[in-house]
Amino acid sequence: MRQLLGGVFSLRKIDMSWAKTLMLGVFDYYNMKTIEAHQILPDEAHWTIEIPDLSRPWSPELAPAWRWSYEPWTYPIPRDSVAVTNLDALRGKRITEVMRWEQDEWEMFAGAGPDVTEQERRVVPLGILLASDNSLGPVVNLQIGSGLWRDDVSEWHPWGTSQGVKR
């Protein structure tokens, strides 16, 4: 482990199933079938849902946020869609507010969006959030300018109503 500004980081050897996908061209360039590579891991306080365990062979169950690097895109929205989200959502807390602002842009927050500070905001591929939480499926059907809300235990509701949304 090594302490650097902003946290403690460690190294872990990665499985070849990840290396062949992430190390584009390295195997051809060096004319090798295997190359030892390591993942830089943050401490638990800085872990987020898109950080996979690269020491284990890739599978969509173990690394759902990376599914679209290996599988075809299955949603009726652009693959390069993004979401402005917050660190709480990226650390696994339940997303409770969603708005679709553009063809390929959403806001998705765990907690009240207006309470999210600029320092807590992140822009991430929407696929990361969709793959990490199956309950987010209805957000891909939102019309531009529409939103959904829920509390920690309820189903999705369109903004301005208390009736649930069909999945």
Report each predicted region and the residues it spans.
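Acidic, proline/glycine-rich low-complexity IDRs
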Residues: R2-R167
